[in-house]
Amino acid sequence: MGKYHLLLDCSYIREIPSSPVSVFIYAGRLLQGLRLSTTFDVTALVCKGLDDYIDSLAGYCVDKIVVDIQDTVTHSIALDRLLALIPFDKELRRKHIDVVITPHHIESRYFFPKRYHHHFIVHDLIYRRRLKEKTHKWKYACISLWRWILFRKVRYFISISEETRKELMKLKKKDSDVLYNSIPFNFQLQEKPVESVCGRRYILDVNRFELYKNAETLIRALYELKDQIPHILYLKGYNHFPQDLMYLQSVVSELKLKDRVIFDTSNRTEAEMRWLYTHADLLVSPSLKEGFGWTPIEAAVLKTPVLISNIDVLKEVTCGKLPTFDPYSVDDLASKIQSILTNPPSVEERETLAALYKEKYSLKGQIDGLTNIILKHLKEENDGFRR
């Protein structure tokens, strides 16, 4: 039997971002891995004008179907989505597409007919909280009902963690398979020093500057320790939420920590990010909520000591191997930081943990898992058809 033809729906990428976006990187990783697949030939669905950007994410010239997302069948995008009508259906048939994957379910423009075995990948459902906070309750109810109607049409969901799977089941009453992320590092790449912290001891946090990422607790923990440790706090993120960043900066000013805290919103290269990880005395991940949590694993793979908040998803994806703290307690975080800085894990412990995560979160493992999930669903449909 020949290969299946898989369409990776990248139409949720509608502009070239000013800074890296994790769900865009995720699509690039899938394209990189699927290129080597012996099961699938892959085509990307790409918005007009973004051909080169998608190629840069994938690292090669991807086979593409290029679309204008304003094109419709019924003159209504909403009706097209409701009826699963695709303006480029002839192109899908010409390429003999068997399976469609949408790597980011929230921004999905297209809902594909049943014959295309459409799979949605769910990273988290945090958008519901954001929407509820910023929208009048009646409008929120209407939007929620509309999304519920659309998502009932999707047969296959894939969650990036068991915790996301549970949340999807609770909120959408939809079960899903679990497929973990892979580590997006090129381990052959030489590190490039970040001059602003060369020769300085620092604690690192790599996250968006959004309040639920909980950098405030980390800042306040540093304040508790400022006379006991020499470290600065290096907060690496992006200015996607300016009000939240301004609030965090005001906390630093209030505590008179401006000389001890660095906010870095620049576009660091992968070589610079690797340097930041490997030269930190400690990476702290203080999040109150995550869909997966890449950064603790990235740091541990690079053999940096790591401390994580005790939320279930971080304990899940780190296999219960990392020390934890109560993310609502400044005192607990300060105590745990001081303990690890005083008694860091041994070189042997770090190497063992790095090897574990590097194998568990390999690109090959991710693509093998995705392949098994899709083949399982195709078999279930074929068996059901025969019956």
Where do the model's predicted regions map?
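Carbohydrate transferase catalytic cores enriched for Leloir-type hexosyltransferases
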Residues: 2-387
